[in-house]
Swiss-Prot record:
SUPFAM superfamilies: Ribosomal protein S2
Assigned keywords, A-Z: Ribonucleoprotein, Ribosomal protein
Lineage: Bacteria, Bacillati, Actinomycetota, Actinomycetes, Mycobacteriales
Gene transcribed to yield this protein: rpsB
A Pfam family that the UniProt record links to this protein: Ribosomal_S2
Presence of keyword Ribosomal protein: yes
Region (Disordered): 225-264
HAMAP family tied to this protein: Ribosomal_uS2_B
NCBIfam families: rpsB_bact
GO BP: translation
Name of protein: Small ribosomal subunit protein uS2
GO molecular function (one): structural constituent of ribosome
Family: Belongs to the universal ribosomal protein uS2 family.
């Protein structure tokens, strides 16, 4: 069964690139034609690259990895949050905080501060003894932290891979990932640089339907990876139980041999 069909890609407008005057010549090989001043992306290639990205994400998650979904522009925010939440993966959909990967230790401290403020807000007497102004300041701090870091609240280490919508806008995230040798999976529009992406998906990174469809493909790969991981763990547990059983059966025989009286 295909990960996604040509019809779905067409319906979502994945084939529409940028105006011909706004392009990156390195994307030439992914362009099918030009129509009314707009580049049309070769969806046959998109299908091939989607399969490669899907398998990579699936295997990454199957081996215990995590995928960070990143898309802070308006057209990507909802898709990134919805699909990441659907499969329990972290996401960034408002602002990329510099050092989010390369200085994760400091980011972790801010995450702890956010959780501290959330616990204070949830407690019955969390703000007891504080003035209205202090409560207001703490609430503002919590809201700001939640907006920027809420999607990575449960991320305890740097991710195994990144799914990025618009590598130009998220160039800092791409640079940090490269610095830490974290693979990048991303939509490549006709104005992007394919050299900065490990697993490219040629397509429209501006249309809401396109970003939603392609993010859904990646979240489905995560879902499949989780299933594969569970199956492997179950198989390993069965093998371990099978190895232990013969040992348990041999133990009484050995005990009887030790207790038998010596012949006179």
């Amino acid at each position: 069964m295909a990960v996604v069909t040509m019809r779905e890609l067409l319906d979502a407008g994945v084939h529409f690139g940028h105006q011909t005057r706004r392009w990156n010549p390195k994307m030439r090989r992914f362009i099918f034609t030009e129509r009314n001043g707009i580049y049309i992306i070769d969806l046959q290639q998109t299908l091939t690259y989607i399969d490669q990205a899907f398998e990579f994400v699936k295997e990454t998650v199957a081996h215990g990895g995590t995928v960070l979904f990143v898309g802070t522009k308006k057209q990507a925010q909802e898709a990134v949050q919805v699909e990441a939440d659907r499969v329990g993966m972290p996401y960034v959909n408002h602002r990329w905080l510099g050092g989010m990967l390369t200085n994760f230790q400091t980011v972790s401290k801010r995450l702890n501060r956010m959780k501290e403020l959330q616990a204070m807000d949830a407690a019955e007497n969390g703000y007891e003894g504080r003035t209205k102004r202090e409560v207001l300041m703490l609430t503002r701090e919590r809201t700001k932290l939640e907006r920027v870091l809420g999607g990575i609240a449960e991320m305890t280490r740097v991710p195994s891979a990144l799914w990025i919508i618009d590598t130009n806008k998220e160039h800092i995230a791409v640079a940090e990932a490269h610095k830490l040798n974290i693979p990048v999976v991303a939509i490549l529009d006709t104005n992007c640089d394919p050299d900065v992406v490990d697993f490219p998906v040629p397509g429209n990174d501006d249309a809401i339907r396109s970003t939603a469809l392609l993010s859904r493909v990646i979240s489905t790969a995560v879902e499949e990876g989780k299933k594969a991981r569970e199956e492997r763990q179950l198989a390993a547990a069965k093998d371990a139980a099978g190895d232990a059983k013969p040992e348990a059966e041999e133990a009484p025989v050995a005990a009887e041999a030790e207790e038998a009286p010596a012949a006179e």
